[in-house]
Amino acid sequence: DGDNVRTGLNKDLGFTPEDRAENVRRVAEVSKLMRDSGVVVFVALVSPYRSDRETAASLFVESEFVEVFVDTPVDICSERDPKGLYAKAAAGNLPNMTGVGQIYEPPVSPDLILRGTGDLEASANLLVAAILEA
């Protein structure tokens, strides 16, 4: 989880494009080490730039990396906002917020697209089915 990683391994990083790239790179490298040890790894991370996601994917053989795009409009994210981040961004207190103050580049061809506007249980079931098929 991105929040967990940013309190430890990546606590020295901010939210500039360069720091975001380094955040994704470090998480991918650790994930690769874990995968090489036989662990099945799930990474929940905001990765706004395609090039960073492509770099992460390049560390793995194709069958080991599954890109899941949770396609959720910013207004829905703002409504759900459990941490109050979108409210802070709207007030101008969080200028680097992905999708608000910084761009998000959607994946070109993700392995799975989950609609964030739909039923959460149905989305979870689609994710589990995709994992079991992989």
Can you name each region flagged by the protein language model?
Residues 1-36:
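Conserved substrate/cofactor phosphate-moiety recognition/catalytic segment
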Residues 15-18, 60-62, 83-87:
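Short, hinge-like loop/turn segments at secondary-structure boundaries
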Residues 13, 53-54:
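Conserved ATPase-coupling elements of RecA-like P-loop NTPase cores
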Residues 32-39, 58-63, 104-107:
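Conserved catalytic network of the ASCE P-loop NTPase/AAA+ motor domain
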Residues 1-2, 37-47:
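Short beta-strand segments at enzyme active-site cores
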Residues 42-44, 48, 60-80, 114:
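Conserved phosphate-donor/acceptor-positioning beta-strand/loop module used by diverse small-molecule
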Residues 7-9, 49-52:
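Short, solvent-exposed loop/turn segments at secondary-structure junctions
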Residues 71-129, 133-134:
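Small-molecule kinase domains that catalyze NTP-dependent phosphoryl transfer to phosphate-bearing small molecules
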